[in-house]
Design a protein with these regions (language model features):
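Conserved C-terminal "lid"/linker of ANL adenylate-forming enzymes
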Residues: 77, 116-120, 135-174
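Generic structural signal for well-ordered beta-strand positions
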Residues: 42, 68-70, 158, 164
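Short, ordered coil/turn segments that flank beta-strands lining enzyme active or ligand-binding pockets
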Residues: 37, 63, 110, 153, ...
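General small-molecule cofactor/ligand-binding pocket signal
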Residues: 34, 104, 149-152
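Short, small-residue-biased leader/transition segments that mark boundaries at the very start
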Residues: 1-2
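AMP-binding/adenylate-forming catalytic core of the ANL superfamily
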Residues: 11, 51, 56-144
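Conserved AMP-binding/adenylate-forming
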Residues: 5-66, 73-76
Length: 174
């Protein structure tokens, strides 16, 4: 289910398992959706909210009127004019790493921002610096590759267990 906190209700469904599992959400009949010029999701759900909702969710629409979430507008790294969606980098790397990690950014004089990888410092892990660099070079577009890898004791998480992006950004600046 796709739920917007602002609506306090669900506005769409998707199958998460089985042969028909999909990353595409199907809005309820009473809900209409569209994209802003920045590709953020705009929701009109008059049965649950009096006003049109403008989200920070970067989305994609398909011909069947379904949508999928690609990431958050506030999780975009602008490196040398190239916009990099943090969640897409993480999703690409997830299947290759054995150690918890997250992507963030740091300021850079030349590029504006650079991609930074924070990884838990687990002694004995197969994820050595050299292996991390090799994986990134093999599976990511060059401009998505982390320019810096920072080992941390624990990844910063919110109280709900989600990545704490603000704290991660601060760690990347050290």
């Amino acid at each position: 289910m796709y739920k917007r906190q602002e609506t306090l209700s669900h506005i769409a469904l998707r199958r998460v398992n089985g042969t028909e599992a999909s990353e595409w959400y199907t809005p309820f009949e009473s809900v209409s959706i569209r994209l802003s010029q920045e590709n953020t999701l705009i929701i009109n759900a008059p049965k649950v909210c009096d006003k049109v909702l403008y989200t920070n969710d970067i989305a994609e629409l398909n011909a069947q009127g379904q949508f999928r979430i690609l990431g958050r507008k506030d999780n975009i790294i602008n490196s040398g004019g190239v916009k990099i969606q943090i969640e897409q980098v993480e999703a690409t790397l997830k299947k290759h790493f054995h150690t918890p990690f997250m992507i963030t950014s740091a300021p850079d004089a030349k590029f504006g921002e650079i991609v930074v990888l924070l990884i838990e410092n687990n002694p004995g892990s197969r994820d050595t610096y050299e292996r991390i660099q090799k994986i990134c070079e093999d599976v990511l577009p060059a401009y998505w590759c982390p320019k810096r890898v920072i080992p941390v004791e624990n990844l910063p998480l919110t109280e709900t267990g989600k990545p704490d992006r603000a704290t991660a950004k601060l760690l990347a600046q050290t």
